[in-house]
Amino acid sequence: MAEKKIFGYADKISVKPGDDISFYVHADGTDVVDAQLVRLIHGDAHPAGPGYKEEEIANEANGVWRVRKQFTQVGSFLTVADPEQRLALSGSFSLCTFVHANSPGGGRRQCLLGRWDAFGNRGYGLWLNPDGFLEFGFGDGGEVDYLDAEVPVLKNNWYFVAATFDAKTGVATLYQEGVATRYNSLLSKVANVDFRSHVRETLRFRPVNPPEIPFLLAGARDHHTLRGDFVTQCLNGKLDRPSVFDRVLTRAELDSYRDGGVPPQDGLLAFWDTTQGYTEHGIGDEVIDAGPYGLHAIGYNRPVRAQTGFNWQGRDDCFRLAPQQYGGIEFHDDAIIDCKWELTRSIKVPDVRSGAYAFRLRTGDAKGMREEYVVFFVRPLKPKAPILFLVPTGSYLAYANEHLSFDAEIMQPLAGQSPILSEVDIELYQTAEFGLSLYDHHADGAGVCYSTYRRPILNMRPKARMSSMGVTWQFPADLSIIAWLDHMGYDYEVMTDEDVHREGIDALKPYNVVLSGTHPEYVSEPILDATEDYIGAGGRFIYLGGNGYYWNVGYHSEDPWCMEVRKLNSGMRAWQARPGEYYLATTGQKSGLWKDLGRPPQKLFGVGFISEGFDSARPFRRMPDSWHRRASWIMEGIEGEIIGDFGLAQGAAGGIEIDRYDLTLGTPPHSLIVASSGGHSDNYQTVVEEVLYPYPGLSGSHDYRVRADMVYFTAPNDGAVFSTGSIAFSQSLPYRNFDNNVSRLLGNVVTAFSKPGKLPGWAWTAEEKQWR
């Protein structure tokens, strides 16, 4: 019998009581699981804390669920709507496209375009063959006839390729020409390589084109007895302006098409103009057929738009300025946006308190892959509590199913330790159906720019630890804040990034104070705007993280579960977007760091990212500002000057990723530094965006800037901000069952911030700082 494994996901990440939510579960080795609704309280099993905590919730859906093996279509491609079967060609024809191959060869066949049935060897197609050569062929249901180019297609270079077939004579031709400009390809004209190939051959028979075979771009249909039809031979690379004709194009016509990107009109059946559809706010998944029949194509697993095309000239770096140069649409054979599993169970969300919830699924011994938590967050029907915990779900998506311990060569020196792998980590790495994170590369080397929660996310579970660092990260780390709020008896509610992105400041207005998560790194402009407007209008914000509000991301307007980022020329980044591909297809905005867009987090929270180190953490020490009459109340009940020389994340409150006060980047000038960390190891390096020239001394034991600053300042209309500047801070809260000076300090701030009216120390707000 197969080893028992269960994995699942939900169709929503944020719900209210009374909402419907659906669950999708995959199982190997069993057809039943035991399901239990639980409220998640604390997610870190570290022995220095209270341990893992959950609360079982009575619900009619508790009990045995029937489950089954599920199948996932991996890889992005385009499906053409062809109801009248105009592309089921029976006579002469031509296939044309511009192509930029990311990883030709390598033993993989990649279909550029065609109507090919890989299971039955029927239809026709234009491929990159397993050796990386352009190939045209067709099948009659038994045999397949192929025609191959003479020279291979080189990776990351633009080509114009075409195949023609004369039904009267049986003659097929292949046309392959390089179309590199000074900007668009890896190689320039000085490289002494042969891009050109023109071959001609008489094929033995005619293709068979059954009506049920779909016309696909960047893939071909296949079939399996258990899963049915699916798409295989997915392309790794870009296509631009592909087309189909019902006649043989001449060499002169192909040359003209190659030079200008405009196809001849005579005999044109379809011309997918990949430059059409751009707006000020991006572009969707539909690719317009500008030919006579409107055979439009729709993307599956979100082929990447807003990519440079064959004719990109380097002058304009945004599709809004030169859409005709942005015909590139990029495909990856390991892309996933939505697993589209069959439904396992739907429920109506019960009338429960706001918080973090999951259906806990178990089979067998309920260890490792025999236990699954399908997590979601419950908002209140109407806000009532004074305190909101803003769940940074965008950042959860960014790290979802990351492969850093396996694929990132720098991870061990960066972390300063060897990874500690579990069987779940290994299963995640070996299973393509779980997809990738925004810290990974596709198999072809391109950075991953999309992430989604319509798939199992194995590290968005309680108890999960980041294998490369040995600490909880993102969601399970944020449960330390929820556990603290619970333990302290505060009246609080939760909401997600997705909610604030959609509703803006109206989502935050009802609350006296908003608490962030430990690492709210990825935020959209609506989230950033709402946070700034909330504070400016008198709201109070407690920033409990490090490296927060760092990357500008976009959410797909119709698919809120899908988030996009482009990583540009600055910032601590796992990959680098290609030149000209810096703008988000989902919003039309330039991505990258908010700092580089004029909105560094210092302007909002008083602190911003300065360093990271994963080998150790350091305590905070009180700074002179902490005795100022404006801020001394924050330290009430705290003895001595050292704060947080303990914790569940590397043993102290200041560390992992840390932020500092910086007036040159917009820290409000009246901000008070109430405490700072120091003495960090040399594993803590100054972040690259703060370095113009590298030089010896940019590390924790040398650079005075490498520190976490705890900052407090007041804002208009009785608003205020308190920032910890450290990811590790909140993971010190549970130490010794929440009886510690970090817990006491945060309690002082939350209690004061959550009460209406003036803050302690308000009478001295206009007083100058006594220390600089």
What are these language model-derived features?
Residues 60-77, 325-345:
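Aromatic sugar-binding surface patches on proteins
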Residues 23, 163, 340-353:
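Short, hydrophobic beta-strand segments
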Residues 30, 40, 302-336, 366-507, ...:
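Aromatic-Pro/Gly-enriched surface loop or interdomain linker
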Residues 123-127, 483, 707-715:
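Short, surface-exposed beta-strand/loop micro-motifs that present aromatic residues
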Residues 559-737, 741-748, 752-753:
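Glycine-rich, aromatic-lined ligand/substrate-binding cores of catalytic
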Residues 8, 13-32, 40-308:
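Extracellular glycan-associated modules
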Residues 334-335, 344-347, 352, 470-557, ...:
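Helical hinge/lid and interdomain linker segments adjacent to catalytic or ligand-binding clefts
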Residues 68-69, 355-361:
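Short, aromatic- and glycine-rich surface loops/edge beta-strands on solvent-exposed regions
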